[in-house]
């Protein structure tokens, strides 16, 4: 029984983890293999509501409200006064939900209320051509008309948990049928006076059959689970397989569609192109480590604290800059205007403003002149001649992350040290970016590719430069941190910046979606974030969202960012053309479609990421999803007519892994068997 392509619909109804007479009726599969699941509670994020002065480690008062269903039943899950440790979590073996008395300060992530039907991403389609979901009635774009009003479970591990919960409910229902007293004794459950109506004999047989099918599917998933394969990787492989099929279809529609498909596949699916072995450096070439050690000295001079400008930059338009930076806490700050008013120092101005807004200078005892020295040095190592990956982009990512960290669902969740690490990671995440891709550096045998063994080349370089600059004169903004704090911050920053490698996108998305959906189907539905792995996963996703936030910004800003990224792509394409290299996808200025690239980018990358983030922080990101959809429609309406793509040798071919190829063969065999059975049934009998 193949159920890997099934999307599980998740109903938000009233159920608590109680004995088997909780009133949950068995749920039957609907047509198309979609199964309705019932939710056991609201997804919660316990806060860290009080802080220690300069330690950066919060005192956690985890007062959590547990909201059930629509009737508002609540559980106060107390206050556990303890500090969070990155290595060991909460001390004394306590959990964030240890029951104590105290007022409720927690924030519940409420189930989505679909006031307006919104287009869903391709993640909610079937991942099997032979097992279409109810919405996959045509091979049009998955974002064209996929609308649903229920919360869908699509990650394999969460589906397994949901199926097992259905099995439990079915067994409970059978136990309440004829002879239920005997069955209750066997199940170890005392009989209760108030029971649901007992199922009839026919419905009982149907329930048994459905239960066996659920168990068969769960066993199939668990039997194929590899010992070194994480549950997040299960979802990642599924999403990659689904995206490959979507892109294969898109590549057949037109020549520009083929380019968009190739770009998305090579950029976001962690697929390395075949390249020649790099040649060793010649005697005339500089030593590779010079890329790190020979950093440019800052031209600024140290200023006394009293003389430091309000926003860290010398400008004769300080009042206009102050008015613009009033939007620092709002989504959609005009970074281009900030750059204009700050003398092309947007990163310094934005970070200086954010640090003051969050009182980080006082919390971590950072001298203002030291912060200014580091920021000016850091911004000086961003290339102003690079169209997109410059200090304006870094400032935009910093400000976007600052807003996301302040969303009501997360504003009291992370410690000051974690917030500092996230902002610092955003600040350095593209420093010294040369304006070309990792693959370009690998293909051209660059020194950076040699230094970092072709693995996240630019991301490793950004980290090395960002931390190296701390060694400059009066630049160490972390000098007053304890050794433990400094090591913890460095670990977090490394993890966050490496996660900005776009080839890791699908794995990051799968891990986040698996985390969110798994917590939804567990009995409490509480996202504890009580260990480093879970906390850094959310922070990595937050930084990744900030890095891919352009499509969710107001259209005038989004259009400027789009023009800049395309200009940078075209500059790389020109360099590749001059060097006799194959031109990378979307880098050929003669054939690339800006409009189609943005629609494809939103459909297959931005929307799946942002709708998953919106699930985590619901309902705080709903306006961003609306903006994302509006921006998509704007670019969609401006796609020029493109000639159909001929099935020539230049068509991009999608490669399947061995596992995916085996699944394809199984599906083809099943299809052939079905066809043969159909033909044999149509033969006249003799």
UniProtKB/Swiss-Prot annotation:
Keywords, A to Z, come to:
cAMP, Cell projection, Cilium, Hydrolase, Magnesium, Manganese, Metal-binding, Phosphoprotein, Zinc
List, for all copies, the residue spans of the domain called PDEase: 313-642
Q: Where is the composition biased (Basic and acidic residues)?
A: 124-133
GO MF, one example: metal ion binding
Q: Where does Mg(2+) bind?
A: 430
Q: Can you quote the record's cofactor note? A: Binds 2 divalent metal cations per subunit. Site 1 may preferentially bind zinc ions.
GO BP annotation list: cAMP catabolic process; signal transduction
Name the cofactor(s) required for activity, per the record.
Zn(2+); Mg(2+); Mn(2+)
Its UniProt entry gives the catalysed reaction(s) as:
3',5'-cyclic AMP + H2O = AMP + H(+)
Q: Active site located where? A: 389
Similarity field = Belongs to the cyclic nucleotide phosphodiesterase family. PDE4 subfamily.
**Protein name as it appears in the record:** 3',5'-cyclic-AMP phosphodiesterase 4C
Originating species = Mus musculus
Q: Which gene encodes it?
A: Pde4c
């Amino acid at each position: 029984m193949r159920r890997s392509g099934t999307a599980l619909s998740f109903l938000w109804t009233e159920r608590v983890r109680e004995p088997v007479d909780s009133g949950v009726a068995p749920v039957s599969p609907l047509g198309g293999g979609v199964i309705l699941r019932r939710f056991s509670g609201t997804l919660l994020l316990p806060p860290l509501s009080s802080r220690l002065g300069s330690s950066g480690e919060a005192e956690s008062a985890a007062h959590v409200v547990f909201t059930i269903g629509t009737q508002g039943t609540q559980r106060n899950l107390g206050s556990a006064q303890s500090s969070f440790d990155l290595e060991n979590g909460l001390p004394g073996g306590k959990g964030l939900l240890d029951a104590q008395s105290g007022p409720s300060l927690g924030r519940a992530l409420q189930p989505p209320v679909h006031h307006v039907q919104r287009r869903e991403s391709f993640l909610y389609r079937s991942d099997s051509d032979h097992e279409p979901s109810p919405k996959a009635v045509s091979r049009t774009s998955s974002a064209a008309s996929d609308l649903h009003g229920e919360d869908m479970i699509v990650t394999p591990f969460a589906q397994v948990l949901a199926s097992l919960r259905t099995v439990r409910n079915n067994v409970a229902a059978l136990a309440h049928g004829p002879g239920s007293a005997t069955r209750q004794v066997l199940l170890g459950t005392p009989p209760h006076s108030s029971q649901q109506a007992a199922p009839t004999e026919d419905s009982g047989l149907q329930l048994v059959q459905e239960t066996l099918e659920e168990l068969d599917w769960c066993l199939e998933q668990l039997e194929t689970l590899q010992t070194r394969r994480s549950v997040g990787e299960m979802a990642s492989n599924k999403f990659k397989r689904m995206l490959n099929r979507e892109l294969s279809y898109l590549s057949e529609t037109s020549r520009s569609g083929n380019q968009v498909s190739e770009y998305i596949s090579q950029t976001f699916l962690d697929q390395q192109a075949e390249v020649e072995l790099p040649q060793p450096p010649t005697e005339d070439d500089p030593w590779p480590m010079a890329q790190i050690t020979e950093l440019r000295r800052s031209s600024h001079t140290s200023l006394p604290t009293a003389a430091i400008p309000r926003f860290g930059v010398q400008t004769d338009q300080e009042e206009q800059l102050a008015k613009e930076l009033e939007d620092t806490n709002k989504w959609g700050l005009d970074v281009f205007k900030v750059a204009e008013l700050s003398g092309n120092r947007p990163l310094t101005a934005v970070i200086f403003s954010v640090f003051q807004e969050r009182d980080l200078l006082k919390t971590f005892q950072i001298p203002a002149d030291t912060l200014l020295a580091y920021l000016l040095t850091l911004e000086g190592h961003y290339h102003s001649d690079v169209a997109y990956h410059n200090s304006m982009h870094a400032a935009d990512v910093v400000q976007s992350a600052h807003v996301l960290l302040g969303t009501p669902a997360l504003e009291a969740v992370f410690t000051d040290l974690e917030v500092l690490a996230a902002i610092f990671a955003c600040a350095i995440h593209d420093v010294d970016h040369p304006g070309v891709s990792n693959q370009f550096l690998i293909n051209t045998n660059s020194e950076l590719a040699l230094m970092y063994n072709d693995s996240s080349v630019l991301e490793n370089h950004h980290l090395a430069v960002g931390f190296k600059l701390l060694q400059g004169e009066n630049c160490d903004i972390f000098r007053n941190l304890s050794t433990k704090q400094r090591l913890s911050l460095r670990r977090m920053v490394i993890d966050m910046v490496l996660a900005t490698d776009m080839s890791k996108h699908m794995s990051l998305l799968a891990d986040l979606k698996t985390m969110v959906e798994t917590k939804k189907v567990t009995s409490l539905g509480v996202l504890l974030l009580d260990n480093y792995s879970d906390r850094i996963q959310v922070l990595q996703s937050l930084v990744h969202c900030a890095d891919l936030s352009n499509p969710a910004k107001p259209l005038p800003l989004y259009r400027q960012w789009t023009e800049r990224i395309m200009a940078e792509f075209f500059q790389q394409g020109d360099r590749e053309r001059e060097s006799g290299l194959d031109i990378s996808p979307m880098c050929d200025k003669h054939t690339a479609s800006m409009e189609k690239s943005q629609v494809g980018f939103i459909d297959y990358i931005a929307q799946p990421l942002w709708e998953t983030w919106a699930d985590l922080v619901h309902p705080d990101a709903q306006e961003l999803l609306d903006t994302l959809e509006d921006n998509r429609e704007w670019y969609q309406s401006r796609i020029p007519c493109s000639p159909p793509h001929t099935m020539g040798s230049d068509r991009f071919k999608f490669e399947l892994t061995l596992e995916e190829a085996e699944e394809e063969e199984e599906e083809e065999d099943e299809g052939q068997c079905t066809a043969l059975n159909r033909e044999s049934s149509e033969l006249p009998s003799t």
